[in-house]
Amino acid sequence: GYVCSVESNNLTVATNNLDFLKVLNGALVNNCDGSVLAKILGKIHHEPLDSYIGADIFIKYVKMCRFRQFFLGNTPEVLAGLKSNLSKIDPKINGMRFETLPFRKVDEFDYEGIAKMINDDNPDIIWVSLGAPKQEIFMSKLEPYLNRGVMFGFGAIFNFNAGVGGVKRAPNWMLKLRLEWLHRALEQPQKNIPR
C-alpha cells in the first residue's frame, strides 16, 4: 500500500480531478501535512484535528533504526547527500538502495521493472520523492506490482535531509509557530505561491 501526505495543493488537485481523488482514496493513510489545512478540516468536521508533517514522520522512522528502507526518486546529488546524512543516524542505511528514476510522464514509467528492482531488495518502507501530485499517482500505479513494503510519498523530505540543492526545512521557531507553509512559500515562491 501507500501513504500520501496531503496538503492544500493535493486537496485542490483532488477537488478538480476525480482520478486523483481516487488515488488519494486508495491510500492506506492520508496524513494531514499542514496546520492551516488541519484547522479548516477541523472546522468542517466539528472536531479538533492536528497535522502530522511528512518530514517528521520520515525522520521518526529513520531514527527507529529497525526498518529496511528503499529511497526512490529525486536527483543523484540529492540521493548522495541524503545517504550520507541518514547514515550518520543509522549506519545500516549505507547498505540500503537509493535509486533515481528517469524524468518522464507518470504514465511512461516501467512499473514492472521498477517493482522488480524494489522486490529484489525486499524493503519494509519505500520512500518516493517525485513531487506532488506525480508521486501519489506513481505509487498507485506501482502498488499492484509490489510484493511487500509500504510506500510513502513525501517529496521534499529528500531535499530537506540531503543538505544540497538549497531546499531547507523551516527554522525551529517557524516550526513551533506552525509557519512551515510560509517558509516554503518564501523559499520557492514560483512553485509554492500558486498552489
Cite the ranges covered by each PLM segment:
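Short Gly/Thr/Asp-enriched flexible loops that form oxyanion-binding sites at enzyme active sites
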Residues: 83, 136-145
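Short, flexible loop segments at boundaries between secondary-structure elements
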Residues: 101-106, 147-185
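Short glycine-rich anion-binding loops that position phosphate/pyrophosphate groups of nucleotides
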Residues: 8-11, 130-135, 157
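Short, conserved loop/helix-junction motifs that constitute active-site signature segments
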Residues: 23-25, 143-147
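N-terminal nucleotide/polyanion-binding subdomain common to many enzyme families
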Residues: 1-50, 55-56
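A charged, well-structured terminal subsegment
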Residues: 184-195
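Proline-aspartate-enriched helix->loop->beta-strand connector
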Residues: 118, 122-132, 148
